[in-house]
Amino acid sequence: LASAATFAGAVAWKVLPRFFGAAKKWRNQSVAPLLAGLALLSAMAGSGLGVAVERLLLVEALLLFATLMAFMGGRIIAPAMAGYAQSEGRRLDARVQPGLEGAVLILLGLAFVLNPLPWPLLRQLAAALVISAGVLSAIRLLRWQPWRCARADLLILLLGYAWLAFGLLLLG
């Protein structure tokens, strides 16, 4: 347990300074708090706080990890799909899709804040927010036109992003 907390602290100490202050847009600035939250939740997990608290921490970590995956997946897949489309003589208009990306980040951030609160109505709202983020992630994926892709490496990335969208729907 102590070694896990030490490792999480060391990773945060090494990685976080690179992200703080370097980004200009709020979507890019969200990476540092995401990584800090994951490090903190990792350090707290298994700390003997009780099964209910550890389960809540696990769900919170899952929300943060899904947020990071949605953010990073879009930053990797969008230019790769645009380059692939260009190599085939096509133009992919929907690339990073900052509106959808921002909406997913906001929805998952709100769900992260609302989920641990003790009121059932707020937990239901958090679940609805996660489902909405899953729907928006699926829309984002479809706008990349995965059916036009024949490259195995890109198909695997698209499949991973599809699982993320599906997982958010199930988590909600």
Predicted regions and their residues:
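Hydrophobic alpha-helical transmembrane segments of multi-pass integral membrane proteins
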Residues: 1-172
